[in-house]
Amino acid sequence: MRAAIFAAIGALLLSPASCQSGMEYDADNLAKPTLSIKTFRGAPQNSFEEFPLSAIEGWTGTTKTVKIKCPEELDSNLHVNNATMGYLSSPLSTKLIPAIYILVFAVGMPANAVTLWMLFRTRTIRMTIFYTNLAIADFLFCVTLPFRIAYHLNGNNWVFGEVMCRATTVIFYGNMYCSILLLACISINRYLAIVHPFTYRGLPKRTYALLTCGLVWTTVFLYMLPFFILKQEYYLVQQDITTCHDVHNTCESSSPFQLYYFISLAFFGFLIPFLVIIYCYTAIIWTLNAKDRRWLWYIKASLLTFVIFTICFAPSNIILIIHHANYYYSNTDALYFVYLIALCLGSLNSCLDPFLYFLMSKITDHSTAYLTMVKLS
């Protein structure tokens, strides 16, 4: 039901009325906002932004707002402010972030490859389907990481083309929410197996697992469509670089759907699954007693899951909402570089998920014996 609601909202936000990009013009040929994905702000050459005159140093007159006109054809060559230029050329963006991505690639790529190899050799299907999909999502993410590493090491200069930029952006964000939803599905599966063993025993596990994973992938795909539909690649005149997703054209201004899109993404893609996971593991630990051999393993799995959500998912989703709220209401992008750092930490989940599989595989072995005992009793 949660994933179905998630998909419905995604479809609503992707409808023609809410997903058009670019600008509309009123009778005075003044730009009016439509939907676009917001990052750093960049202005086309020979254009002006809307700003209060009181912001000009030394201005003592009455406060007014200057209405500006955007070019009818959107320009791919942009100018950015000094703060954005400082971030794009800083060691944080060109050294620290790619160093973390290199670490994630070096650990996550072989770890998820080994996990997939072990899963394909496993004949049991109780948990294999969920973990296979989780490992595939992480593996795809690791495959695209070298492109982002090269991008940052090259001074945030993207050389792989618009299509590849959109594809890596979709996979980058899609991996996070696909992982979150699959971890929630795994926790529900374990909850039913331990807290409601008789109900779990009568379920068509393979069918439910395949349908659930298919719904997760479909939901995430629908929600990621705006990143693939809208332009992500822009050339920055001052620095002579081409950015990927990090800068957008200010003439593609935001609409209320912009804010609602990201709020719904964080709410249905992070908060609700996180609450479901907390409830499921709490109920499991409460049901099992300390003498049960599975109890300690579930404590470890719960702690690891909590670490994954706290370090990898919580910061980026919280900052995501704050950033886009500031962008919509105050037209500022000061938090975006903080959000990029949080996203960088979020990539660590691709390294931690394989260890969660190894923990849960131990639990599954004990659960198999437990269900056999229940069946014979």
From Swiss-Prot:
Post-translational modification: A proteolytic cleavage generates a new N-terminus that functions as a tethered ligand.
Cytoplasmic topological segments: 121-127, 189-205, 280-296, 361-377
Membrane spanning residue stretches: 95-120, 128-147, 167-188, 206-229, 260-279, 297-321, 336-360
Primary localisation category: membrane
Keyword field contains Membrane: yes
Extracellular side: 39-94, 148-166, 230-259, 322-335
Task performed by this protein: Receptor for activated thrombin coupled to G proteins that stimulate phosphoinositide hydrolysis.
Family: Belongs to the G-protein coupled receptor 1 family.
Name used for this protein in its record: Proteinase-activated receptor 3
Source organism of this protein record: Bos taurus (Bovine)
Gene: F2RL2
